[in-house]
Amino acid sequence: MSAVPIHAATSSDAIRLELEEVLKLQRAAYFAHPYPTFAERKADLLKLKAFIKDNRDAIVDAISADYGNRSRHETLFAEIFSVVDGVEHTLKHLKTWMKPQRRGVDIKNFFGAKNRVAPPPLGIVGAIVPWNFPINLSFSGLIAAFAAGNRSMVKMSENSRHLAKLL
């Protein structure tokens, strides 16, 4: 997946216009390449994992600033470690999840036929993230969206402004 530029808007109209522009870019990117391969999905998930690991301390500090003062250990256990584990679990099962699934066929009407279903990516997935556990709730959705081959747009809570600025 190609990177889509990220900008921070300030007013409501500016935010709406920016989101519409990002959605337009996401749609164009999706229609240009609607079926990411296993390697592309794996690369996206590894980038997500690397981002979390490389920016762990900055994320913890931003969340603490948003909460007023949140325990570093709580953030590490409830947010960082669970997301990293989620990526690792998804990577472990991704190839199996991408395989076409067998479905039954009416033997009377279609004798000898075989049926398979390969769920396609849906396109762009939107996530509106609440203020509590913002990394866990946003990145868990991103993990699932990327594993399914989708693109994603995330709208962080206004109460998570330090973290939103970091992301």
Residue ranges and their predicted role:
Residues 1-115:
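N-terminal Rossmann-like NAD(P)+-binding subdomain of aldehyde/semialdehyde dehydrogenases
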Residues 106-167:
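Rossmann-like NAD(P) dinucleotide-binding subdomain of oxidoreductase/dehydrogenase enzymes
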